[in-house]
Amino acid sequence: MRGKVGTAVTAVVAVLLGAFVTADAASVRVRCETRGDRSKISVDGNDLAPGSYTATLKSPASAASGVTAPAKTAVGDEVEFDFDSNANDVAAGATQISQSFIQGNTVRGEIVGGGVSVSGTATCRVKN
């Protein structure tokens, strides 16, 4: 009888450990757009643990410093950050950046919190 119980416990532990190993890793998607008079960037995190997160942008992607958005709480497993130079979008909750924030047509976004740090780089779409 002990052998059967030990085998059952081992099987349950193996299944639980397998669930942790196969869980989706946190990811980030960075999108950006630039116009002559506007910079617009979104940094979206997915497969995140519950918690509070911040997002930091750098442009060009290799810049030493950047702009950090106020902390947000993940909803489900997602958190979204918007950065914009348009006053209406800033009034609607986007973090303000300058019209000329995007340099070299690239940005790097990083989401930090909940014990993770994920980052990504994007080449910006140019609109006239």
Segments from the language model and where they lie:
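Bacterial N-terminal signal peptides that target proteins for export
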Residues: 1-9
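Bacterial N-terminal signal peptides
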Residues: 10-18
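Sec/Tat signal peptide C-region and signal peptidase I cleavage site
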Residues: 20-25
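Short, surface-exposed binding/anchoring microloops in extracellular/periplasmic proteins
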Residues: 26-68
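Short, aromatic- and glycine-rich surface loops/edge beta-strands on solvent-exposed regions
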Residues: 55, 96-116
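Solvent-exposed serine/threonine-rich low-complexity stretches and specific carbohydrate-binding patches
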Residues: 62-86, 122-124
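Short, solvent-exposed, Trp/other aromatic-anchored flexible loops in extracytoplasmic proteins
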Residues: 77-103
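Edge beta-strands of extracellular beta-sandwich domains
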Residues: 115-128
